[in-house]
């Protein structure tokens, strides 16, 4: 949704249940200009999340994945999805099975450009379980805790290992310290945008949207980092993961 607001043609691959939550989710995507052509409708509950925010804007999330964990590879229209320039992956909870994770391990082989944000659910699964996805990743977008958990090393050393695995760009989110990016032998640190923190929900995804916007527009990695920090800063100025997402980077 963050990329769609910035004018990038986007589509969502996922699964929703036959309930009101699923209907609301699809309506939200369509209202924001995100194609739902690849959304699978199924019997059962849609995934939901309860988000708790403290007085400092920090948050905790309780997730019920519902049918989200049950996306079989054969349910995805991969041929039609290939028209998009990039596919972005993030973590499933894997509480109700490994179908969705296993589908991700297959679909990464079908695209030339893959971006991947592991989230804590995948970081906790360990490097062995994530290796196939990582070896097919173009842009890796972890935060510091996630990459250090995956590789059991500091983030700079871990990023070097990522490059050795064939990943083109590693962009590590450092929270209030901004971000650190590595591409080949080049390393840059990009300072954060000063802002008033209201709610950190969605900050990582907002950064991803800004960074990938820059990448898709052919920007230098440092400018991609600035765009990521900018979109994340706008996001955390308001409550919720979407309310603050900008419609322009100007």
Curated annotation (Swiss-Prot):
Family note: Belongs to the carbohydrate kinase PfkB family.
Enzyme class: transferase
SUPFAM superfamilies for this protein: Ribokinase-like
Pfam families recorded: PfkB (PF00294)
Keyword line: Kinase, Transferase
Gene Ontology molecular function: kinase activity
InterPro entries: Carboh/pur_kinase_PfkB_CS, PfkB_dom, Ribokinase-like
Gene3D superfamilies per the UniProt record, alphabetical: 3.40.1190.20
Highest taxon of the lineage: Archaea
The protein, known as: Uncharacterized sugar kinase AF_0356
The enzyme's E.C. designation: 2.7.1.-
